[in-house]
């Protein structure tokens, strides 16, 4: 894109958002509040998607299959997309955009008795704005990390299977509609972890691991890992353990890769693992973090972007990179209320 055209477009985007304070722009809120939703972006962050999740009641019958879409190059307003096929909405699904398609993977369904069932479904939202069915996930998971490499390979990392947390790295080839298994991360199997992918590099942090026999079902993990993807073999990953990241959050952090900045950005989350209602597995109140931090891939170090970011959030469905900066779509606020807000994160 030519520079004058890009600057004009950037200005038009700036005028499409309202202002929060003196210099912090704010995106329009979604038509409905959702948490544990899956989010994705296309066209370099100009098209944003929020899919499924749970509404303000946070009950099994408030789980939705609705899709909300915003085209930043048009009116910069949210509108309803084609709902995700299926008899029930899902929670904790993962999504990524590649080849002008949104790939929606896994998640779990909840019934009236409170049972949670992880599903293998892969749904692909194509340019014609209809859903196609992709090949099922070999190891179905929920609350995993996903990211895209070379606009073709979608990496699904960790998550909770029917047998508990896993350390699998599963790779979906968008061109071939096929799955393969990549080098698993060598750390403790976890779900509710956070991370992203940029510049052939995966960074993942924290999550929940299986708890002790006489304690809560899940406890927090503090492990951080970096994986370098082989340039010739997308299934080969060289993993390295990283030092602890800034902040205290360990579960439900929003994360995502920024190819523009060569960083993986993280925001919010809680100190202890929790369910989709925001209730900790150990029965204690979960403290929501307001820290925004990032891993700088080029310089290979952590950096704190803000110790007191506005609109602290948990279960926000990941971070999407836009031309105005990274955004978090939906989730639960610090009072555990489900929100429709779209928060533009600070940049260092």
Predicted regions and their residues:
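Intrinsically disordered, low-complexity segments enriched in polar/charged small residues
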Residues: 7-8, 95
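Bacterial N-terminal signal peptides that target proteins for export
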Residues: 1-7
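Bacterial N-terminal signal peptides
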Residues: 8-16
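Kelch-like beta-propeller repeat domains
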Residues: 21-348
């Amino acid at each position: 894109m030519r520079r004058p055209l890009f600057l004009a477009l950037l200005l038009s985007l700036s005028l499409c958002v309202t202002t929060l304070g003196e210099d912090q722009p704010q995106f329009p809120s979604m038509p409905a509040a959702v948490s544990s939703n899956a989010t994705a972006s296309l066209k370099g962050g100009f098209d944003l998607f929020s899919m499924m999740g749970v509404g303000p009641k946070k009950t099994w019958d408030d789980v939705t299959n609705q899709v909300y879409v915003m085209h930043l190059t048009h009116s910069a307003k949210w509108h309803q997309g084609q709902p995700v096929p299926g008899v029930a909405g899902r929670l904790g699904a993962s999504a990524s955009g590649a080849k002008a398609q949104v790939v929606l993977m896994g998640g779990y369904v909840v019934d009236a008795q409170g049972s949670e069932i992880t599903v293998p479904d892969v749904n692909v939202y194509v340019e014609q704005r209809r859903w196609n069915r992709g090949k099922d996930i070999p190891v179905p998971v929920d609350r995993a990390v996903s990211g895209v490499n070379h606009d073709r390979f979608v990496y699904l990392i960790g998550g909770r299977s029917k047998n508990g947390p896993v350390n699998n790295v599963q790779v979906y080839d968008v061109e071939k509609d096929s799955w393969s298994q990549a080098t698993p991360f060598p750390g403790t199997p976890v779900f509710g972890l956070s991370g992203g992918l940029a510049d052939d590099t995966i960074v993942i942090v924290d999550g929940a691991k299986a708890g002790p026999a006489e304690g809560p079902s899940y406890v927090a993990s503090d492990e951080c890992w970096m994986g370098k993807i082989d340039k010739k073999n997308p299934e080969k990953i060289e993993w390295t353990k990283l030092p602890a990241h800034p902040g205290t959050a360990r579960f439900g952090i929003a994360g995502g890769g920024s190819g523009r900045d060569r960083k993986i950005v993280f925001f919010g989350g809680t100190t202890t693992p929790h369910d989709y209602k925001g209730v900790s597995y150990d029965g204690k109140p979960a403290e929501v973090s307001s820290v925004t931090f990032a891993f700088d891939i080029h310089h290979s170090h952590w950096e704190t972007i803000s110790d007191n970011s506005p609109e602290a959030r948990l279960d926000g469905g990941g971070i999407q990179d836009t031309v105005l900066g990274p955004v978090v779509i939906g989730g639960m606020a610090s009072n555990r209320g489900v929100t429709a807000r779209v928060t533009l994160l600070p940049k260092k």
